[in-house]
């Protein structure tokens, strides 16, 4: 039934139109409102941190990609739809029982433009939005330069493969998508309007449909020819020979590469055959051409390389792959900076030839041996330096060094941060959580080579106040008293790893002019944030935006928010760097330092590539577990540089990026893309540079590669006989590899303390020590790697063997049984240290933690014993084991009396300190070490003593120690009141 005049479209009543309009508006608000809020908040935040130009550049790049891809895809699809519609047959039988698409055809005919433009624009916008994620490739292509290194196969600069080729491939992929979508759109349109009919029993195709479909099919095949051409260059990153090596091998060069050229020619001929369908009605020629292309891809592109690999290459792989392995070695060394310009190799016997006390370098090394393990002591720091239930330290503490009174000392460091997860009761109220408990308080450090006192009584070790760190605290209280070993002028921490764990992560600071401070500072004082960081929410519009973003109406109605209020967001240092520099990959371990009286976080950042020709692939990131439980490997890269050192101010969140590698062409490209965002290396303050550490993530990648790529000769590389392995962690039962460790050791030239990141390496599928790798962190030699290579037939034990030898020692085993009655045992870092002019000293701290059955009691680790071990010089692989409450005593056990004298003495007197948790004062604070400008002088060497006499002396010393222990207990009992 019709209403109104014939040909007139029905008109909705005004009320219905208003409802439809309102409904559409609400739908649009629900769909796009949250995204618009996020965009506005990002605009404010990037402006606050001073990196709005980055946000604008990325946004404009992505919008340009969306526009370009949408225009191309929509244009090609719309052209296909328009041509198919205009060339439709004039007469199409409209019988629903014989034509199932008749109803759809009628609907389209009523709104042909709506359907045509709607489909084309929708497909174009969707493709554009997906393509916008390739903005990195676009920027690298536009601003990329040269490396000054050419590939060994084609003779092109490396810049072509890493800057240009990925962009060309991306453009080609989207042209593929556009043409395939156009082909499908044309096919469906012709079918809808009768140009292609399948209901007549044998099918029917109009001339217009045949021509149009042939053109699009030919275009697809022509694009495939271009893809084959680009495939030639991507062979240089082939994974065919992995895990042996990466890059084009013999089969790739002598079979795959010619095959690609053959397939290019066949694809071009096939495309021409499709285009002939424009003039010829016979479709058998294009069909045969398509069959030829498929058959050629199988035979020429697949079977031929497979046969060559199986019957020609594999039987002679060591010889035929030799030049390609050489290419892989050279490219990998260049891509990861593990070549001769950056790595120094030295032969090392693995057996000591001198007493450590006679070697100045060893005197320094022993004096700086680290006994505190940052992986174990976080709970100890928290329990002894927490102050309040809502303060905490990171799960893993950090290691850094400071020069106090001229003496370089390494410290275990941590920041006393606010822990949002620790707030309880009324502390979790919105006002308290976000406006009162807003910041942490203080920088806490402990000398890494000493504790307050030695823990001696094994039976009552958990009841003693021994084996704890000696803290150097720089917080609000110490600022007022002027007692700071490491001076900090602003100890408040608004940005950190722990504080950012709030969900949602934000704090509201500031307030109305003249209002009283409300942020918790100490038990007797409040504070008002005065930093430059933070997004203003002093106006109602911004308050409304943030109320919408965090879904919290109290933003609008709270009287605590005034005209000067700010909201602090994105408080994780690593996240802040990632957001302002999205082209960088950040290290997983930011660490706090004190520079010019302020606490700042240092974040190591890397430039990476995944298409460096012939370079081995590796991952800077560990495996990632998805919410569904699927474990995926981290992003694979084939080039990495620690080109940027970033800092984040812990008080106001200021982010600063410093160039740290002037020779990195990738960083130079990004600095052209985002001018002014990265400061030059000349602007790095000396005080900040002194705290730069060689990053762990990079070192772990380099040591795993050096396990293979220290080999120069391709044939030896192929046999893997000379390979090394990263040792398993002997203190971890999860089959994890041993983490590298930061240590202060004596420098070979000056004997001064040198801060390094080091790792032992064992033989391939063996447990004996094969090498020792260390990376310099001192400004003068930063980045240099030193590799000590042991003989291939060495019997020097590796970490796992040493661990087994130490814990199976009769003294260790018997006392461990005693300790385990009431304690949990934690083994600390097993440190490997070059010593004794050719030997290796292993040092491992042993921590105990009282076992408690009460849920309200708190327990935390304390240093109880020190294990040391060295190879016995006069035996085939035998070892000496030292086990004592102090490092000095352990060293005397393995090297003889006198060596322990050069070890750092304990830092305090256990008799004068109250037990932890007893309500007394905190453990003793650190005192500056004595000032020295030269390494400690080695004590004079005594006469050589026969082994039998040494054994007798050790027994006598043990008896004397037992007598002294009984005497000390008697004196303590006599001095105790009432005793």
UniProtKB/Swiss-Prot annotation:
It is a multi-pass membrane protein. It holds the Pfam family UPF0182. Residues 898-948 are annotated as: Disordered. Residues 913-946 have a biased composition (Pro residues). The chain crosses the membrane at residues 19-39, 63-83, 114-134, 174-194, 211-231, 260-280, 288-308. InterPro entries: UPF0182. It is found in: Cell membrane. GO terms for cellular component: extracellular region; plasma membrane. The keyword Transmembrane applies. Keywords: Cell membrane, Membrane, Transmembrane, Transmembrane helix. The keyword Membrane applies. Belongs to the UPF0182 family. This is UPF0182 protein MRA_0066.
């Amino acid at each position: 039934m019709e209403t109104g005049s014939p040909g007139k479209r029905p008109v909705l009543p005004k009320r219905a139109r208003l409802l439809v309009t309102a409904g559409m508006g609400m739908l649009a608000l629900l769909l796009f409102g949250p995204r618009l809020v996020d965009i506005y908040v990002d605009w404010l935040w990037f402006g606050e941190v001073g990196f709005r130009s980055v946000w604008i550049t990325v946004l404009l790049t992505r919008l340009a990609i969306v526009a370009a891809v949408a225009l191309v895809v929509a244009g090609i699809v719309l052209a296909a739809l328009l041509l198919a519609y205009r060339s439709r047959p004039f007469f199409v039988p409209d019988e629903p029982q014989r034509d199932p698409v008749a109803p759809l055809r009628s609907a389209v005919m009523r709104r042909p433009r709506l359907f045509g433009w709607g489909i084309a624009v929708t497909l174009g916008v969707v493709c554009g939005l997906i393509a916008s994620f390739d903005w990195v490739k676009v920027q690298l292509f536009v601003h990329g330069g040269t490396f000054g290194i050419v590939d060994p196969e084609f003779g092109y600069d490396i810049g072509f493969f890493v800057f240009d080729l990925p962009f060309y491939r991306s453009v080609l992929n989207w042209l593929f998508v556009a043409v395939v979508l156009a082909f499908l759109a044309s096919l469906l349109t012709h079918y809808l309007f009768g140009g292609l009919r399948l209901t007549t029993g044998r099918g029917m195709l109009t001339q217009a449909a045949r021509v149009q479909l042939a053109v699009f099919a030919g275009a697809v095949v022509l694009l495939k020819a271009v893809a084959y051409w680009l495939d030639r260059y991507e062979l240089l990153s082939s994974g065919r020979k992995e895990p042996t090596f990466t890059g084009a091998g013999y089969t790739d060069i002598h079979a795959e590469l010619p095959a690609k050229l053959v397939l290019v020619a066949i694809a071009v001929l096939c495309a021409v055959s499709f285009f002939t369908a424009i003039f010829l009605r016979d479709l058998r020629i294009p069909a045969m051409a398509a069959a030829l292309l498929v058959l050629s891809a199988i035979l020429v592109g697949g079977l031929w390389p497979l046969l060559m690999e199986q019957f020609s290459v594999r039987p002679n792989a060591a010889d035929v792959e030799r030049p390609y392995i050489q290419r892989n070695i050279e490219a990998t060394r260049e891509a990861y900076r593990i070549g001769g310009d950056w790595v120094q190799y030295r032969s090392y016997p693995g057996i000591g030839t001198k007493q450590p006390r006679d070697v100045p370098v060893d005197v320094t090394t022993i004096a700086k041996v680290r006994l505190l393990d940052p992986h174990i002591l976080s709970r100890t720091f928290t329990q002894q330096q927490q102050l309040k239930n809502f303060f905490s330290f990171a799960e893993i503490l950090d290691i850094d060094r400071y020069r106090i009174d001229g003496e370089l000392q390494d410290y275990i460091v941590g920041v006393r941060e606010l822990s949002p997860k620790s707030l309880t009761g009324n502390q979790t109220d919105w006002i308290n959580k976000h406006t009162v408990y807003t910041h942490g308080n203080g920088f806490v450090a402990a000398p890494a080579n000493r504790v307050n006192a030695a823990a001696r009584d094994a039976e009552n070790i958990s009841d003693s106040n021994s084996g704890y760190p000696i803290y150097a605290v720089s917080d609000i209280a110490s600022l007022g008293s002027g007692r700071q070993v490491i001076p900090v002028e602003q100890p408040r921490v608004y940005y950190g790893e722990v504080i950012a764990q709030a969900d949602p992560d934000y704090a509201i600071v500031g307030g109305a002019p003249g209002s009283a401070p409300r942020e918790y500072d100490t038990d007797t004082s409040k504070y008002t944030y005065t930093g430059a960081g933070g997004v203003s929410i002093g106006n109602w519009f911004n308050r409304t935006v943030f109320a919408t973003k965090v879904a919290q109406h109290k933003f609008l109605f709270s009287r605590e928010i005034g005209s000067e209020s700010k909201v602090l967001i994105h408080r994780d240092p690593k996240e802040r760097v990632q957001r302002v520099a999205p082209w960088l990959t950040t290290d997983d371990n930011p660490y706090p330092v004190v520079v010019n009286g302020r606490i700042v976080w240092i974040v190591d950042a890397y430039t990476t590539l995944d298409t460096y020709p012939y370079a081995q692939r590796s991952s800077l990131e560990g495996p990632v577990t998805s919410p569904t439980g699927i474990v995926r490997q981290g992003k694979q890269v084939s080039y990495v540089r620690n080109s940027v050192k970033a800092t984040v101010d812990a008080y106001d969140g200021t982010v600063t990026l410093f160039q740290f590698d002037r020779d990195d062409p990738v960083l130079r490209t990004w600095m052209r893309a985002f001018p002014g965002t990265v400061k030059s290396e000349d602007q790095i303050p000396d005080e900040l540079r002194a705290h730069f550490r060689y990053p762990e993530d990079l070192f772990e990648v380099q040591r795993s590669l050096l396990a293979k790529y220290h080999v120069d000769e391709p044939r030896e590389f192929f046999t893997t006989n000379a390979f090394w392995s990263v040792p398993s962690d002997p203190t971890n039962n999860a089959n994890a590899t041993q983490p590298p460790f930061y240590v202060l050791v004596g420098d070979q030239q000056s004997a001064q303390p040198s801060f390094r990141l080091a790792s032992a390496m064992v033989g391939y599928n063996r447990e004996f020590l094969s090498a020792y790798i260390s990376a310099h962190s001192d400004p003068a030699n930063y980045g240099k790697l030193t590799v000590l290579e042991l003989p291939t037939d060495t019997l020097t034990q590796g970490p796992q063997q040493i661990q087994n030898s130490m814990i199976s020692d009769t003294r260790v085993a018997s006392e461990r049984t005693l300790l385990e009655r009431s304690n949990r045992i934690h083994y600390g870092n097993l440190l490997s240290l070059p010593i004794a002019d050719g030997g290796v000293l292993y040092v491992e701290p042993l921590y105990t933690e009282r076992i408690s059955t009460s849920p309200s009691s708190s327990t935390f680790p304390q240093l109880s014993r020190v294990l040391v071990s060295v190879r016995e010089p006069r035996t085939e692989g035998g070892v000496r084991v030292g086990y004592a409450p102090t490092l000095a005593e352990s060293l005397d056990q393995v090297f003889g009396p006198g060596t322990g004298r050069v070890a750092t003495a304990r830092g305090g007197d256990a008799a004068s300190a109250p037990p932890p948790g007893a309500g007394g004062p905190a453990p003793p604070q650190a005192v500056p070490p004595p000032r020295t400008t030269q390494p400690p002088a080695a004590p004079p060497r005594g006469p050589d003593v026969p082994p039998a006499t040494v054994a007798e002396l050790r027994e006598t010393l043990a008896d004397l120690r037992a007598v002294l222990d009984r005497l000390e207990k008697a004196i303590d009992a006599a001095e105790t009141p009432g005793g």
